[in-house]
Amino acid sequence: MFPKLGMGELVVILLIVVILFGASKLPQLGAGLGQGIRSFKKSFSGEDEEKPSTPGATSSDEASKAKQA
C-alpha cells in the first residue's frame, strides 16, 4: 500500500519537520507522540489507569469502616 521509504526519504522528511516545527519543539512532539501511542495500546489491551483495589469500595467507605473498628 505504501512505498518503502529509504534512508534518503527519511532524512528529507526529518529536515522538513525540523524546518516546520523548529529543533526546540521536537522533544515535545516526540513525548506527545509517545504518550498517544501508549494510551492507544492501553485502550486495546483493556487496561485502565484508575482501578480501585476492591470493586465498589471508595475511600469514604474505607474511612468509615476504619472509624467503626
Swiss-Prot record:
It comes from the Bacteria. The chain crosses the membrane at residues 1-21. GO terms for biological process: protein transport by the Tat complex. Its main location: membrane. GO terms for cellular component: TAT protein transport complex. Coiled coil: none annotated. It is a single-pass membrane protein. It is found in: Cell inner membrane. It holds the Pfam family TatA_B_E. Residues 43-69 are annotated as: Disordered. GO terms for molecular function: protein transmembrane transporter activity. Keywords: Cell inner membrane, Cell membrane, Membrane, Protein transport, Translocation, Transmembrane, Transmembrane helix, Transport. NCBIfam families: tatAE. HAMAP family: TatA_E. The Tat system comprises two distinct complexes: a TatABC complex, containing multiple copies of TatA, TatB and TatC subunits, and a separate TatA complex, containing only TatA subunits. Substrates initially bind to the TatABC complex, which probably triggers association of the separate TatA complex to form the active translocon. Belongs to the TatA/E family. Part of the twin-arginine translocation (Tat) system that transports large folded proteins containing a characteristic twin-arginine motif in their signal peptide across membranes. TatA could form the protein-conducting channel of the Tat system. This is Sec-independent protein translocase protein TatA. It comes from Anaeromyxobacter sp. (strain Fw109-5). The lineage of its organism: Bacteria, Pseudomonadati, Myxococcota, Myxococcia, Myxococcales. The gene is tatA.
